[in-house]
Amino acid sequence: MDSNKYDWIVVGGGISGITIAEILCRDGKSVLLLEKNKQLSSETSKVFHEWMHSGSLYSLAPDKLLTLRYLLGATDDLFEYYNSFSGMNLCPTESGVIVDGTGWFNNDYIEYRYRKHLFNPVWSALVSRSINIIDLLSQHDWLRRKAGSDYDDSRVRFSHWFNNIPKQFASKSDFFCKLSPDITMNSRKLISDILSVALGKDLEIVTESSVLNIIEKNNSVIVETNSNSYHAENAVICSPDMISKFLDIPIKTSYAPIAVVENVPKDEKSFVELDYNLKKCINLLKKGDGIGQAGGVTMEREKDVDSYLSYIIAEHKDRNPGIKVVDTYVGLKKELVQKGEDRNYIYHINQNSKNIWSVVLGKFSLAFSMAPEFYRRIYHKNPPKIIEIPMEDVKKGLISETSWKEIIINSR
């Protein structure tokens, strides 16, 4: 048994666990991070698209712009609480954001391609509104105003529903194209930077440590693993599987089939095609050197994955005939879905008992907002905004590679 008593034990070494561990360490808390796998960020954070969402994609969602506001709030918090990280190269301006040099984010803006349905007035109106919202976000004054609380239905004028419909009719393409504020990211650089700061503040990490039991006793928590027992004042569970196991909370699993392709043309953009028929929505995120991730939407049923993957590949080859599929994989997405929801695109922070908390993250991009909000819920104040040095180098191999990168490395 470990004789140390930590302020916090964090169960789960994905982006949720890493950002929460860092924000706690930033304030001088003693933190132990437990991960069942050999490497950190080796499940959901490994397979995702590396897509930094501005919220624009959810301007089409019928949720009163709730998801959009959550994602804009994440960018607010990114600027406020992560701006002193060396790799944080997204910069606020008086009119949108810019990517400065190399670092966490790439100067690779994702093009939205709305499929034209000229005889579907509802879709045409939704597209018109979405385009207007993108314009508002692209022109937002990040230097003077926060965005998360600035965009709701009151910002959408009646004219926004129809003033872009003539442009859709005038377009000769099957799609109406609009460059969005969404960008691609370098997730391993980002995770490594955040982890290095936490390690510099004495974060302890134990990998290959499967949690067998979590016991709340005498105003503290005992976490029993396959190799040891650890004591802490509090614990937060950031692993969906562990949340389901120990807290009896149902977690929904869905499936995201992705093809890793090469020979992507240099003049092709990262893009997403949008259609009211969701299964026709495909996307391509460029990775450099002619490599790309070709994907679509997330499937609810595993049995539908193979046929849908074939559809995705065929559609991408139709647009870029020269691409070659290197390999494919299926990313698992595990979400806490509330009653009446099909998907969870936000995050949930729950206090399950006096000393045990749980967190489920809907989008990687929301981690920058989720971690500071977790700190606020616990300590009823804002976390420190400035990180301290020295930082500690992250041991090679501690963080897993992304699935797409592993596929490319193994193919060469």
Task: Give the positions of each predicted feature.
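Helix-loop-beta segment of a Rossmann-like dinucleotide-binding subdomain
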Residues: E94-K116, D153-K201, V297, S353-L361
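Conserved Rossmann-like nucleotide-cofactor binding loop
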Residues: S16, Q39, M242
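Helical element adjacent to the flavin cofactor pocket in flavoenzyme catalytic cores
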Residues: S173-N226, Y230, N234, C238-S239, ...
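C-terminal catalytic lobe of FAD-dependent flavoproteins
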Residues: I323-R412
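Glycine-rich FAD pyrophosphate-binding loop
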Residues: R26-V47
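Active-site substrate-recognition segment that forms the wall
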Residues: T19-I23, E50-M52, M88, G103, ...
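Dinucleotide-binding Rossmann-like beta1-alpha1 core, especially the glycine-rich loop
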Residues: E50-N163
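N-terminal Rossmann-like FAD-binding beta1-loop-alpha1 element of flavoenzymes
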Residues: Y6-L33
